[in-house]
Amino acid sequence: FKLSWLAPTAFYLEVGGELLRGNHFPSAGAANGQGAWTLFSKIGGDMGISTSWQAGVSYLSTDVVGRPSNTSSGEFYGDSDLFGFDFVIKWAPLGNPRQRNFKLQGEYFSRDEKGVFDGSEYRGDQYGWYLQGIYQFRTGWQFGYRYDRLKADNTGVTDTELDPMGRDLYRNS
């Protein structure tokens, strides 16, 4: 079930929420058909004739019932909450992106999990972000750069088979 409202304003403003089964990651088990819910808001607009922007915030709360691990036979039971912020800025000469355009976008997220994994208390905090820019300099030709980073502080599972290294990952691409 999704409910959203697009405000009748001179700029873009949408707010909404969803009730979900919660059968897929980061949730699991569908919690009797009501395992997850979201809230979101997006705002955006034009900056002159060639540039537009949009930013948003979102929140996802899930009840996790028996989510399996990828690396062991244990399962997680508890709560998983995810907060996110995203933005995008687009530029195209005179608003026409066919020949040339540039897009800069990024996102930040933070996830907090509390519960029980394989009979032991578990608390996991993960956060990550990415920033990327893509420039199309000619029809069919573009180049870009992306940097992303992920940090996981999974108290209770660090140095176990679930998280053997206490990960802090990054990538350039």
Q: Which residues does each PLM region occupy?
A:
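Outer-membrane beta-barrel pore domains
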Residues: 49-173
